[in-house]
Swiss-Prot record:
This is Xylose isomerase. Binds 2 magnesium ions per subunit. GO terms for biological process: D-xylose metabolic process. It holds the Pfam family AP_endonuc_2. Its cofactor is Mg(2+).
Amino acid sequence: MSYQPTPEDRFTFGLWTVGWQGRDPFGDATRPALDPVETVQRLAELGAHGVTFHDDDLIPFGSSDTERESHIKRFRQALDATGMTVPMATTNLFTHPVFKDGGFTANDRDVRRYALRKTIRNIDLAVELGAKTYVAWGGREGAESGAAKDVRVALDRMKEAFDLLGEYVTSQGYDTRFAIEPKPNEPRGDILLPTVGHALAFIERLERPELYGVNPEVGHEQMAGLNFPHGIAQALWAGKLFHIDLNGQSGIKYDQDLRFGAGDLRAAFWLVDLLESAGYEGPRHFDFKPPRTEDIDGVWASAAGCMRNYLILKERAAAFRADPEVQEALRASRLDELAQPTAADGVQELLADRTAFEDFDVDAAAARGMAFERLDQLAMDHLLGAR
């Protein structure tokens, strides 16, 4: 298998990823700003399928209408020249100080109304550029102290905002779906809708739940100590995996945004195995930050590494599933039984079945080994290239 990516692999990158200048809370930028046009061109050369953007990534905050149109025109020309796509866009409701207490859930009503108008304006642009998915990350929607935010009321305001956006795209005839991106903390001390599970529960309370799904990010779930492939499996099970952000994370700490494959390699293997075996058809979107130690050449090497690592893991996962010994080990671990309904015959038949309780030999069942260790070692062998 070739590890050279092509547009058919559907790899995408945010302008803010390779465009990150290395500025953090403890140090200034280590790289110059990147022109979005150059970003499009270089990613196309690397084999990417598309780019994504926050409004302020493409159009600097405070630009005049004339300047705005100029930025959009140059960007569109770069897309046309390279064949790159824009499958997703989002709104920056976290950088400007006006959003210090959030956008959709700011205590200040004027800020909430401004956040909605800013979002709607960028939805219009996203649709013009062909985006079908609109991501919402509420990085500033939260609090650091208990009395500062009535969370129940804040969730009312969050619901109001998403319901209004759903009403807007429906009234405009847009083929737009929203993907909520969970994160437990950072930059706020505690962020609303912190995990995939929280977001899925919230979506069911919206007026048009069919328009809303999730955009889980590897590092965000792992910051909460959760199993990312399990979260993705539940999102797929719910039919709500509308988008995904791929990167790397090493345990429960700040949001590292490492290139995909760095950090928890086992989780990355199981994630790729799941996405490919489940037939996920959306973009494989990389939301990472090239370390501030890197110069511009290192930026592109890091981006290329994201795609290469995914393709390597895809090959290893396919080999794992095709291995006859693995298939036998899966049967020995009773995965085929898990796929069988427990009581398809109904509750009355279950109650009448003495082998299910009265005559069930619990000691014999308890003595049966599950052979999970052998199965897991086979997976490790494939992951490490030993088979």
